[in-house]
Amino acid sequence: MSNRVIIFDTTLRDGEQALAASLTVKEKLQIALSLERLGVDVMEVGFPVSSPGDFNSVQTIANTVKNSRVCALARALEKDIDAAAQSLSVADQFRIHTFISTSTIHVESKLKRSFDQVLEMAVGAVKYARRFTDDVEFSCEDAGRTPIDNLCRMVEEAIKAGARTINIPDTVGYTIPSEFGGIIETLFNRVPNIDQAIISVHCHDDLGLSVANSITAVQQGARQIECTVNGIGERAGNCSLEEIAMILSTRKDSLGLETGINAKEIHRTSNLVSQLCNMPVQANKAIVGANAFTHSSGIHQDGMLKSQNTYEIMTPESIGLHRNNLNMTSRSGRHVIKHRMEEMGYGNKDYDMDTLYEAFLQLADKKGQVFDYDLEALAFMEAQVDEEADYKLAQLVVHSDSTEGNATATVKLEIDGKTVTEAATGNGPVDAAYNAIARASQCEVNITSYKLSAKGEGQNALGQVDIEANYNEQSFHGVGLATDVVEASVQALVHVMNLTSRADKVADCKEKIQKDRSELGGV
């Protein structure tokens, strides 16, 4: 049996399901390209039948990514499989991942069918998917709670139908390692054609055991692990890609297994996903948390000064976290910025040098010295920029009375090419600025969440504002980044307004299409 473990990343499918607001196609593509550089073997990038937006993002990624196999999810229904195949058809090689529930509670309560009927649907779905590609993966949803006799039967029949990968999910994170490892061991012992497929596992983290269960599974013969960057996903999340990659690398002496992951891309990819998904990484998170390589105890610090191996089983450099002694100021040339970006793992196609350097100079003039985390933040923010924005902030002036708490703000907005100026008061400068923008734009959004975080250290650190807002029963996520908190707050709101404007245009297009169809007699 091969010692190579296939890494199947589902950040853009299962991971995105945990987000309060969906990612844009541009943001998904940026993450997909980062995953490609990270070296994932397969990336599951969406559920095409679920929406035109998901279909479009899958198609865009499939047309762009070349070094990782792109996969789309489909229920055991022909319409789902058709949508997946159509969205993926632009790729040279692709995978269709079809699934159906197999546990008793799912079969009886959710599907309201007999197990034999579900088995027939599964076999039919695999055979239908094989019409489009030889690379078909089949998942037994809630396999962790499926009676073992039924699971063995389902796996055997799916392989006979043509599935080349069989995925065994612990969908609700219920099993413990001894149980889950036992399931994989039983499949290898009892399914006669098991050698004709790769066994995959997809473990959720409801009991905090997703990584442990996945490692136990590969010890029993599974050779694909499904995971997400930073472990994001439904409920408590998924198996963490970075933890799996570094466990298999650091403990190769014990496990004897390896992956194709370029570990030096882990830190950069983790930061990118955290930023674009608006999901901060907890400080004590294994591998990528801010404290993962921090030593506070005097005894630990003394040991580290004598030898890093005393308290570090891996180095920061091994995951691409570089110690930087290069000071970047407004006197730094473009070559310095380009060199630093390359050291942090960014390629030329990840950012526009002209845009980044202009933003760098503006920031350097404000705060003097610019650090790695500043450059990363500026690079990430490129994905938030909409070149065809309907709303642009031209000017912001704020006057605040610190004793009374009242403030006045004047904003100048460019709206569809026209300049509009409005002033308003409010309970603090941010409230005043938001009131002025509401007057100027006549765009009514309901802000449901406001988060402020520092990107860096000291009084001149960049401030990032993340807001979530409801508009026409949809949720939107806006981001702003500036050394001034009020400016960052305004940027975030303007970002949301541009997203809502785009949503209105999409709705108008849909309405026109429906009207045209109606006039043509429903054709």
Swiss-Prot record:
Catalyzed reactions: 3-methyl-2-oxobutanoate + acetyl-CoA + H2O = (2S)-2-isopropylmalate + CoA + H(+)
BP term (GO), one: L-leucine biosynthetic process
Domain of life where this protein originates: Bacteria
EC numbers for this chain: 2.3.3.13
A Gene Ontology molecular function term of the record: manganese ion binding
EC top class, as a word: transferase
Pfam families according to UniProt: HCS_D2, HMGL-like, LeuA_dimer
Cofactor(s) in the UniProt record: Mn(2+)
Keyword Ion transport: no
Alphabetical list of PROSITE patterns matching this protein: AIPM_HOMOCIT_SYNTH_1, AIPM_HOMOCIT_SYNTH_2, PYR_CT
Gene Ontology terms: cellular component: cytosol
Keyword NAD among UniProt keywords: no
Residue span, Pyruvate carboxyltransferase domain: 5-267
Compartments where located: Cytoplasm
Region Regulatory domain: start-end pairs: 392-523
Subunit record text: Homodimer.
Entry function: Catalyzes the condensation of the acetyl group of acetyl-CoA with 3-methyl-2-oxobutanoate (2-ketoisovalerate) to form 3-carboxy-3-hydroxy-4-methylpentanoate (2-isopropylmalate).
NCBIfam families: leuA_bact (TIGR00973), PRK00915.1-1 (NF002084), PRK00915.1-3 (NF002086)
The family this protein is said to belong to: Belongs to the alpha-IPM synthase/homocitrate synthase family. LeuA type 1 subfamily.
Protein known as: 2-isopropylmalate synthase
Organism: Shewanella sediminis (strain HAW-EB3)
Originating gene: leuA
